[in-house]
């Protein structure tokens, strides 16, 4: 079609020197609005961009030649990433409500355009991006895996306040909307269509062409974006009888169940889901404009709070990782990672099978090796089980399942490993075994191949000691279960080539993980800091404290599990071995734990043996096993030893802060920000507290040092504060300025 008009609207702002939008109107009245923020990798809404969009909508509404509109992005893999998080981060409590009401007006203008509107979504369409398309009549999404649509604001400690909390329930129904809003979910195109969030899923290569044709066919059709009650959107699918009941007389049941679910999930530590639920509850069925005002009120209670600041800080740290190569702190200049095309895995047990599944899931061919056929079978079965679960939930097609399974291969020898760019070993955690498999492997692979050890405690430098090429030996420590835990520690030894470190860092990101680079040191970072947490928990039990009270206190603090539950989960024997490793290096600060040794001697090693501190069989499952006290040489918890929850929390958290300070002083990790990222993603340290160092800042260095000195006097020298903390207390410094 011939083009009648092409125009841009420049924004007079230093941050946006040129127009973020380009409008084209074709001869038949089809307008195409392209979003392409200059100088940015993603489209996002800063205040100037919102103002520009607003002016364009005013212009479109006044035109008589426009018959339909298609909104499309020119950023590869990105539709609209939402609001500029930098602006959110700067907002204080009681921030100008115009930052919410302004976009409300803009998106209402979009909804009220006097002609049909179609969103052509290719790539991330989240937050304000999703709220944009909720204000349009029809939504088409590409089948690209990068196309993700949803409202993740809850994960930033706020709520979808640009119309999302109001429009989504009216459009797709109450239950489906709450599922997205309260969990901060983003959906792929297929799931978004099933939810009613998009109308069609289209091959990415022809999305624009299809969207234009779709919009032309809708010329003259009744609008959906403002034809619902009070000027809101219409419901895209007719409600079932059950839905009609639950959105009418029975809606109290829906909100009651949702509130109970939120409390179970968050323990009340995160105010945003409850605030969002309240906004939906008040706004659902209210006049549309009034419902939007509830969003203004609701988000106003969340902006600038400590929880919001902690979660936004976490977001920025994750964004930094995406841009990094992993060697910035090593002082080696610019290093490009190698591209990994094929992965080998030595050891096909629980960890090895999990790593093989993860690599194949990201499209990498994998070759597994084990000395036992049954272990290889377990590796295959583990991958199949995870994929079958996705298949069952319709998050994967049968064809995708078959393709991914075909990427897995296995053998009892090294056949095929000569073509692997990297081999990840997950064999027995014994140095002699690591040395043996490394020596065997080096005989059959080219000099360019990388050997990555999944060891959790053994020094990488020592593993590489006898290697012909120690520069290609590196640590790649996954956490169990591999498919769930987001952290990977990338550990460089004394001779590890920075290019190898950068390659593992890049591979971890390709696998969907968050990598943190760590210097070779006993326990590395996470297990070293976690050591005192577990050890002090066990010592409290030996002192006669009820272990269920210890776990309860730490869950109340925000930890996902208490130290005693964690012992059962990781294996008491594994924890005892880690304690032995750490105590060899720091005998005064981390003396070997006698409680763990006693339990291992008694055969009480945790969940895997169905014999730990808790029951794992019969009707008593999950309850405390009183015989654990007997194996520790105790008759039962002492009635004379019942510290308060806050005393338990202090006893367990302060040594972690102390060890974090030692790690930073020794250069084990580059910064407090990286340390906090590792502790949140590796241990589940409560994100609402911002991380271990952020929590220490909230307490204040002086208070931390005084509390540690008091504990050192009462309980022993292992609590002696780190020199870094003492200096911070003296100079009134913080980990984060």
Q: Where on the chain are the PLM-derived regions?
A:
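Conserved CoA-thioester-binding segment of acyl-CoA-metabolizing enzymes
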Residues: 2-72, 94, 101-102, 108
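N-terminal glycine-rich phosphate-binding loop for ADP-containing cofactors
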Residues: 3, 17, 21-28, 36, ...
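Amphipathic alpha-helical interaction surfaces in cytosolic regulatory modules
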Residues: 48, 62, 75-90, 107
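Proline-centered loop/turn at the N-terminus of a beta-strand
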Residues: 68, 114-116, 148, 450, ...
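Hydrophobic/aromatic residues within transmembrane alpha-helices
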Residues: 71, 84, 132-133, 192, ...
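Glycine-rich beta-to-alpha active-site loop
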Residues: 74, 104, 108-156, 160, ...
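Short, active-site-adjacent cap segments at secondary-structure transitions
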Residues: 76-80, 126-127, 458-459
